Amino acid sequence: MLMQVKSHLSVLIHDLANKYGDKTALTFKKFGSDKWQSVSWNQFSLRVKQVSNALLNIGAKPHDKIAVFSQNCVHYLYTDFGAYGIKVCSIPFYATSSEQQIQYMINDGQVRFLFVGEQDQYDKAHRVFALCPSLERIIIFDSSVRISTHDPAALYFKDFIKLGENLPRQTEVEALYQSASMDDMANILYTSGTTGDSKGVMLTYGQYDAALRANDEVVPVSEKDRVINFLPFTHIFERGWAYLCLSEGAQLIINTYPHEIQESMRQVHPTCMSSVPRFWEKVYIAVKARMDEAGSVQKKLFYHALAVGRKRNIEYIANGKRPPLTLELEYKIINKTILSMVRKQLGLEHPNIFPTAGAYVSPEVEEFVLSIGIGMVVGYGLTESLATVSCVHLDKKFTIGSVGRPISSIQIKIGEDNEILLKGPTITKGYYHRDTTNAKVFDEEGFFRTGDAGYMKDGELFLTERIKDLFKTSNGKYIAPQQVESLLLVDKFIDQVAVIADQRKFVSALIVPEFRLVEDWAREHHIAFSSREDLCANEQVKKMLQERINTLQQQLAYYEQIKRITLLPHHFSMESGELTNTLKIRRPIINKNYQAEIDKMYEE
């Protein structure tokens, strides 16, 4: 499949508008509204031009920096592509970023104009404004935001856009299109960092061009697809994926609030979505729980359908073999009846492709998703590689548990400590203002050091763990915590888990229960409790969870298995510094915050 449009990001939307005209490009909800609305390619293109003109009118110049501090929304895309049109670099901030984080990024990135989403983001921006010498204006997407008294720097997006409404500077904009270079910087993406060290990854238009071309060869997205956003546009996975889908003429459905994703899916019936493994873990838990509670006949039918789906989609298709005619016919019937009902409950009547990355994917979950007829494409990537390094190629055989084959532009080398090293046109030139770090992150042959351990086998890449996250027990055994944690996260009673093992005699875990279900279980078993603290301290509850964990970890070597657990009465959170903006756990912070609880598990 050839990419339908090959364009520099500065003119991509306008070229697509010339091709698709009044077809729907974007579907979204306005802030505070429950009603879905649509924008055509022509309208999208006009808005982008208006943003380019308005930016010039407030004084933006080529190579200036703007930042977007917002949830996903239609204005986000207008702003990004409007900036690209005049060679302005756009820096995305996570909507959940703290004042301290945005102040650091604004100053490090020398941001002149900050676009914010809702009240929370505006309030934080207003409070740090005086501490950010480069910052000149705050432009607010949501018109219902209350602007602080005497804030001459603030401007609503609806008023900002009027400055470019009649395209007063379009001649200058067109001239800037002509001078667009692949070497210009499109974005600086600040990594949230599991160690707390935030670095600005420089991404050029050339990297985007190479990434779009390489992904286009292996990801079957077309103008027929309806693609819903789940991850924030700040996340390189969602950003790269959204741009790929737009470049193919697909309709983009913008989901603003992650907690509404399942409701949104049932309303708009997407064919594609990128996500992290936790989304599919929760789907797996919910579907399995529903079927286990169903009547015996229904339960039997479901598990038979799952077995047929597994045989056809994994034993044959994934292994590059053609299914026998009898199996194909049985699958056709089961797929149209039972499996389609399961997918319908998710809003996925016509699933096409569902890229999944960002954390370790449990083989159990991957098998389940493929078995019910959803094209999950497991992959691996980094901000520094502009997302995809490797992914499952659905037209080739693949192994459950791998992260697929490298995309065409990437060279992979396995270095010391089994570190994955990368080279190619999608790889960053380095971190903004970090010359010392940049000198260390590339080897003598120019390969980028990922910090991830892995290995190649039969052309496929397998991940082991972040090197800095690998634990070594006091007995000298290595533990990959993410793999152990992913086994536990498929249990309906477990919400969060942090494995402990470094320099310890055995493996233990801090566990945050799924409180609603554990509370129900406790009541059914006549266990009295007056608080979550009571529940977490209860020996029967701990015994029940330890027994379930023992079942889940049977496949692990004995030294990898969790021997003791501590239940925590509250969640790991971003506010406490225990989670990154991408919801990965910060192990050093967790070790520090729960030092007493951890030490207690190792008392003789």
PLM regions and their residue ranges:
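Conserved AMP-binding/adenylation subdomain of ANL enzymes
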Residues: D209-R226, F233-K336, H350
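Conserved C-terminal "lid"/linker of ANL adenylate-forming enzymes
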Residues: F471, Q496-V499, K505, K542, ...
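Structural core segment of the AMP-binding/adenylate-forming
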Residues: L12-I13, I58, G85-L163, M544, ...
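Conserved AMP-binding/adenylate-forming core of the ANL superfamily
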Residues: L26-C73, L77-F81, S98-Q103, Y156-E165, ...
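Conserved AMP-binding A3 loop
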Residues: S38-W41, A186-L212
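Conserved structural elements of the adenylate-forming
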Residues: K49-Q50, M182, V201-S222, F230, ...
